[in-house]
């Protein structure tokens, strides 16, 4: 059997022990792999031989014009859309094209849409508690007692998301940016192997955007992430000088490299940045 390491608190595996059933094999250092993925809707080719990979612990920003196929790509990864052809693997273990959407979610892929989804009539603490107990109904979850380790995880997540002072506030009272961070915290409570974030900075103030960038940068290296975004300042805050950025256009990868490299690419300027 291939050898991989134990998962850390965010669900990542690496080198170290014998692979057990249900565990993600990332012994080659790759958490997500897509090859020649094709998707068509009524004759329109949404994805056209899309090929890309994401390393374990990487924070990958994906940019591109509207209609480039970014959302369709996420739909394929999460099982919402079935590709016409191509390969989509989580690590070397799971062929996502053969799995249903609920099974993929349980396997370790968390997705955050642009609009935050939280339990507005429950306090922040209970939102995190409910997210951690996804195998139970919400009422049973609230009635069951947390052990000390679970309480510590919630406290750590509150601190990480800068919501420790808002733990007892109802989620509906939070600002838009706070709700976005809360939902990311809820996803982290499920210990995902990969987080997909679709325009998480949309609608945020500049201060909230930088708070979110700080949160995601803290997760870099411990949680693999794909961030689809249009806000180039936010992308710059996430990618820095060395982070990799993928530019999509017409359903495939147009360019790939550091942010400075893709911004100088003539194809990118013509297709996206120059518009």
Language-model regions, residue ranges each:
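Helix-to-loop junction immediately C-terminal to a conserved catalytic motif
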Residues: 78
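The feature captures the beta-strand-to-loop junction immediately N-terminal to the Walker
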Residues: 63-65
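ABC ATPase NBD Q-loop/coupling interface
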Residues: 87-106, 146
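Conserved ABC ATPase signature
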Residues: 170-174
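Conserved ABC ATPase "signature" region
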Residues: 22, 141-166, 214, 224
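Catalytic Walker B motif of ABC-type/P-loop ATPase nucleotide-binding domains
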Residues: 195-199
């Amino acid at each position: 059997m291939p050898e991989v390491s134990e998962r850390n608190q965010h669900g990542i595996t690496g080198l170290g022990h014998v692979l057990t059933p249900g565990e993600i094999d990332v012994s080659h250092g790759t958490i997500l792999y897509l090859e020649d993925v094709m998707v068509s809707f009524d004759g329109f080719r949404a994805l056209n031989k899309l090929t890309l990979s994401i390393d374990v612990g990487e924070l990958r920003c994906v940019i591109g014009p509207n209609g480039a196929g970014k959302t369709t790509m996420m739909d394929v990864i999460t099982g919402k859309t079935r590709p016409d052809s191509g390969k989509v693997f989580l690590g070397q273990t799971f062929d996502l094209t053969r799995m249903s959407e609920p099974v993929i979610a349980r396997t370790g892929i968390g997705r955050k849409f642009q609009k935050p989804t939280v339990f507005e009539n429950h306090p922040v603490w209970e939102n995190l508690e409910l997210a951690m107990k996804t195998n139970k109904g919400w009422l049973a979850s609230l009635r069951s007692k947390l052990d000390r380790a679970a309480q510590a995880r919630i406290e750590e997540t509150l601190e990480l998301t800068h919501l420790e002072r808002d733990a007892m506030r109802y989620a509906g009272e939070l600002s838009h940016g706070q709700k976005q961070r809360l939902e990311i915290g809820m996803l982290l409570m499920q210990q995902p192997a990969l987080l997909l974030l679709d325009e998480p900075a949309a609608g945020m103030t500049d201060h909230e955007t930088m708070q979110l960038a700080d949160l995601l940068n803290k997760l870099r290296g411990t949680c693999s992430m794909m961030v689809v975004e249009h806000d180039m300042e936010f992308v710059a805050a996430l990618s820095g000088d060395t982070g990799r950025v993928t530019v999509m256009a017409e359903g495939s990868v147009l360019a790939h490299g550091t942010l400075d490299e893709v911004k100088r690419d003539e194809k990118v300027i013509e297709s996206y940045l120059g518009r």
